[in-house]
Curated annotation (Swiss-Prot):
Lineage summary: Bacteria, Pseudomonadati, Chlorobiota, Chlorobiia, Chlorobiales
Compartments, as annotated in UniProt: Cytoplasm
Protein name as catalogued: Phosphopantetheine adenylyltransferase
NCBIfam families xrefs: coaD_prev_kdtB (TIGR01510), cyt_tran_rel (TIGR00125)
CDD domains the UniProt entry points to: PPAT
Length: 167
């Protein structure tokens, strides 16, 4: 039986920190499904389809990686549906862990067969968050060291589109 995990997140945008956690997960699991959460309460820069395209382009050469969208519903139910035995979460700081720990307990209650695996990214990514990447890029800063080249191109294109629509 293959060891399958899901790696959920908003991924707006997908950063090198996310990629690092995914790479670490692939050292543990045979299959990892990156699951893009679609949350109507969260204002995102990229649409869910743009994030799907972005991540698919990045992981195309990673055997054992698939990408999907969770439009609605509980993550624990989705994990059960795809027969994943683990939920991978990247944890950069204690603050991240407190929230993720609560969620892991809830997911375990809803789907007792699932385990949450907390992975710390490489230290060079501990301060990299999608929200920071968006803000730095919007203010004209260089984020090329923190995102894949395809993400950088999509960021520049999206920011140009937003600039045109706001003028």
């Amino acid at each position: 039986m293959k060891r399958k995990a899901i790696y959920p997140g908003t991924f707006d945008p997908f950063t090198n920190g996310h990629l690092d956690v995914l790479d670490r997960a692939l050292n543990i699991f045979d299959e990892v499904e990156v699951v893009i959460g679609e949350n109507s309460q969260k204002k995102t820069l990229f649409t869910v389809n743009e994030r799907l395209e972005m991540i698919r382009e990045i992981v195309i050469e990673f055997p054992g990686v698939t990408v999907a969208v969770l439009h609605d519903g509980l993550l624990a139910n989705y994990a059960r549906q795809v027969e994943a035995r683990a939920i991978v979460r990247g944890v950069r700081q204690v603050k991240d862990f407190e929230y993720e720990f609560q969620m892991s307990l809830l997911n375990r209650h809803l789907y007792p067969e699932v385990t949450t695996v907390f992975l710390m990214p490489n230290v060079k990514y501990t301060y990299v968050a999608s929200s920071i990447i968006r803000e730095v890029a919007m203010l004209g800063g260089d984020v090329s060291k923190f995102v894949h080249p395809c993400v950088l191109a999509m960021l520049h294109k999206k920011l140009q589109e937003n600039k045109k629509s706001n003028s």
